[in-house]
Regions:
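Extended acidic, low-complexity intrinsically disordered regions
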Residues: 154, 204-224
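Von Willebrand factor A/integrin I-like adhesion domains
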Residues: 155-208
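Von Willebrand factor
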Residues: 6-69, 79-114, 117-121, 127-129, 147-161, ...
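Short beta-strand-loop
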Residues: 52-82, 159-167
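Arginine/glycine-rich "motif VI" loop of SF2 helicases in the C-terminal RecA-like domain
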Residues: 48-49, 110, 138-146
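Short glycine-/polar-rich loops that comprise or flank the Walker A/P-loop
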Residues: 11-12, 144-147, 169-172
Length: 224
């Protein structure tokens, strides 16, 4: 009797690097970020897994260190996450190191996975040696293939640093957010980009994101 092998969807990793420093309490930006992340996870969990399985990890950096808040997990399996809590400094370099470790670990992200998307959110200036860690990330054989997007929250964000983080594979600019609605719009762009890739026959071909053309007439800010 002939046996058939059922093909499994290839992972499409999305790694979110979230600033949870003390300054994120200003204007309740941390609350807006929590609500936007929940909306993102809810949307991605509903995507088809025929071609690609979207997997999400959240790495936070605040206090004195970075840590993995949500390990890389299929989006449809993430039922709920604890809210991010803001405090302390901005150890962004530590987040880059954790992201690099995750991408280089083939038990976490196998060779058959599609190119990762790394999303950086920050409202301030890094308080550690971020340059060394970032150079390792962008020069790594595996990590350099990732698409990198960034959002600056408020006037205090280090926009030059964030511009250095962004590459030209997917979104060629830093999105600037000054309120909850704009934070939400950025994550809608992330969701649209990742969803588009997961439904494509060529998920490694990265779409262009034009932040100026994002619709905002359907936003529900009741959770903010």
């Amino acid at each position: 009797m002939q046996q058939f092998t059922v093909a499994t969807a290839r992972p499409l990793p999305v790694i979110i690097l979230a600033d949870v420093s003390g300054s994120m309490t200003q204007d309740d930006n941390i609350g807006a970020l929590n609500a936007a992340l929940k909306d993102l996870l809810s949307t991605l969990s509903k995507e088809s897994r025929l071609n690609a399985e979207i997997q999400v990890s959240i790495i936070t950096f605040g206090g004195i260190k970075a840590e993995v808040h949500v390990p890389l997990t299929p989006a449809w399996q993430i039922n709920q996450t604890s809210d991010l809590v803001a405090s302390g400094g901005t150890p962004m370099g530590g987040a880059f190191e954790l992201a690099l470790e995750m991408i280089e670990n083939k038990e976490i992200i196998p060779s058959r996975a599609y190119k990762p998307t790394i999303v950086l959110i920050s409202d301030g200036v890094p308080t550690d040696n971020w340059e060394t860690s970032f150079n390792k990330l962008k020069n790594s054989d595996r990590a350099q293939k990732a698409s990198r997007m960034a959002m600056a929250i408020g006037a205090g964000a280090d926009k030059n640093m964030l511009k250095a983080f962004v590459n030209d594979l997917e979104a060629s600019e830093v999105f600037e957010a000054h309120n909850a609605k704009e934070i939400h719009r950025f994550f809608r762009a992330v969701s649209m980009s990742v969803s588009s890739r997961s439904q494509s026959n060529t998920p490694n071909q990265l779409p262009t994101v034009d932040f100026s053309k994002l619709p905002d007439d359907e936003l529900d800010l009741s959770d903010f």
